[in-house]
Amino acid sequence: MGRYLGPSCRLCRREGIKLYLKGEKCYTDKCPLAKRGYAPGQHGQEKKKLTQYGMQLREKQKLKRYYGILERQFVRYYERAERMRGITGENLLQLLERRLDNVVYRLGFAVSRAQARQLVSHGHIEVNGKKVDIPSYLVKPGDVISVKESSRSMELIKNNLEMGRNVPDWLELNKDAFEGRVVSLPRREHIDLPVQEHLIVELYSK
């Protein structure tokens, strides 16, 4: 299945939470979820009792949409998380958080992960002084993520940084230098996403 190309706000309404897919609009009262906090469609306002499988599937879909990844990619992340030491669900979240496009978003260079993915793919981002144009690239502690010098004059990036969004504790931002550093690996408490990752583990453990 290809990448979803429909209205982004429908996905937020489907999952019942803000997925921050539309950038700046998501931080304002114009967000459709604030006006219509129910699922889209003719029966969207009806309360439906989900089965256990339905709940597991809903959590997986929520996580995939939050990070903007496809099923095949998601399965690869899950399989890698299973092989790591520790709790599989938390390992999965850590891997997704370490994606370069997510880090570019978290540092405030972009207002959405989709925009961050474009900045990376178009060669505007460097890791440790070298261009990296792979959105799925996994960062590690000590890595320095920066905007390429020739791209620092872009109004888009400057305006995004001026918004002054909070940066998670596992990252640090030097706004004046257009760069951020990975201080540590992200832990569960750093990830402000209301997802029940244990349900995803149950789904794939069947």
UniProtKB/Swiss-Prot annotation:
Residues 98-161 form the S4 RNA-binding domain. One of the primary rRNA binding proteins, it binds directly to 16S rRNA where it nucleates assembly of the body of the 30S subunit. With S5 and S12 plays an important role in translational accuracy. The keyword Ribonucleoprotein applies. This is Small ribosomal subunit protein uS4. Keywords: Ribonucleoprotein, Ribosomal protein, RNA-binding, rRNA-binding. Disulfide bonds: none annotated. It comes from Caldanaerobacter subterraneus subsp. tengcongensis (strain DSM 15242 / JCM 11007 / NBRC 100824 / MB4) (Thermoanaerobacter tengcongensis). Belongs to the universal ribosomal protein uS4 family. The lineage of its organism: Bacteria, Bacillati, Bacillota, Clostridia, Thermoanaerobacterales. PROSITE patterns: RIBOSOMAL_S4 (PS00632), S4 (PS50889). GO terms for cellular component: small ribosomal subunit. GO terms for biological process: ribosomal small subunit biogenesis; translation. Part of the 30S ribosomal subunit. Contacts protein S5. The interaction surface between S4 and S5 is involved in control of translational fidelity. Pfam families: Ribosomal_S4, S4. GO terms for molecular function: rRNA binding; structural constituent of ribosome.
